[in-house]
Amino acid sequence: MVDSVYRTRSLGVAAEGIPDQYADGEAARVWQLYIGDTRSRTAEYKAWLLGLLRQHGCHRVLDVACGTGVDSIMLVEEGFSVTSVDASDKMLKYALKERWNRRKEPAFDKWVIEEANWLTLDKDVPAGDGFDAVICLGNSFAHLPDSKGDQSEHRLALKNIASMVRPGGLLVIDHRNYDYILSTGCAPPGKNIYYKSDLTKDITTSVLTVNNKAHMVTLDYTVQVPGAGRDGAPGFSKFRLSYYPHCLASFTELVQEAFGGRCQHSVLGDFKPYRPGQAYVPCYFIHVLKKTG
């Protein structure tokens, strides 16, 4: 339905129900350049995530949207036992390549990487007694569209993700500030909190409404690619990514419902405690849920 109204970059499907917007490989390649490696992660993000996991005694971590593996690599390097999954094989190949290149390091030899589908995650990933922490960051969950129009697939995916968390464990999941995007038509001001890319030249935001309801947000990226132009000069690559616009209040209900209400839930705005009506407009909302039952 979405594609008949508005053309996205969903050129293939890596796992049933989840469109792979990186299926042609080109977007995955440019995205890898765009986000960089672990050195491109902001110091604030790294300190926050590592501090949160260590504060709660987490060791066994499931990254359910690992992409090229940049966060998983950081966690492996920091001594965590990591299982990494993604629906896009084009993205996973970068993580698999890194594991192969560093296979002589015991931590990387033990790093588990699998292709998996959020809609069948409980069958795709053996959770055992559950993971100490499950992370789904970088606006990843918003890649899952609402193809049926009732958010039933969102509910199923979140229920499966929550089932991976052991009692007392954490789910850390985020989304962009779509409340601001839908009210203004553009992304919030401020730099990306996750990575410090110097290759971005432009990001154009578009909102698609269906029956007066926001159905999809698209971000059109123009990225400078070193050596892609004539005579080795920088060139430019454009690609589009499409997202479901999760607003804060409705997503809060969804994630709490995924735990059957048995959770402690806090919301951060760009790594800081968020208060509705505050002056600072965050780029991302981060939900931290501790499973209590």
Swiss-Prot record:
Residues reported in the UniProt entry to bind (6S)-5-methyl-5,6,7,8-tetrahydrofolate 1: S4, Y6, R240
Organism the protein comes from: Rattus norvegicus (Rat)
EC number: 2.1.1.20
Keywords for this protein: Acetylation, Cytoplasm, Folate-binding, Methyltransferase, Phosphoprotein, S-adenosyl-L-methionine, Transferase
The protein's role, per its UniProt record: Catalyzes the methylation of glycine by using S-adenosylmethionine (AdoMet) to form N-methylglycine (sarcosine) with the concomitant production of S-adenosylhomocysteine (AdoHcy), a reaction regulated by the binding of 5-methyltetrahydrofolate. Possible crucial role in the regulation of tissue concentration of AdoMet and of metabolism of methionine.
Residues at which (6S)-5-methyl-5,6,7,8-tetrahydrofolate 2 binds: Y6, H215, R240
Chain positions with N6-succinyllysine modification: K46, K191, K196, K201
Tissue-specificity statement: Abundant in liver.
Entry keyword Acetylation: yes
Family the entry assigns: Belongs to the class I-like SAM-binding methyltransferase superfamily. Glycine N-methyltransferase family.
GO MF terms, alphabetically ordered: folic acid binding; glycine binding; glycine N-methyltransferase activity; identical protein binding; S-adenosyl-L-methionine binding; S-adenosylmethionine-dependent methyltransferase activity; selenol Se-methyltransferase activity
Main localisation: cytoplasm
Location of Phosphotyrosine modifications: Y34
Name recorded for this polypeptide: Glycine N-methyltransferase
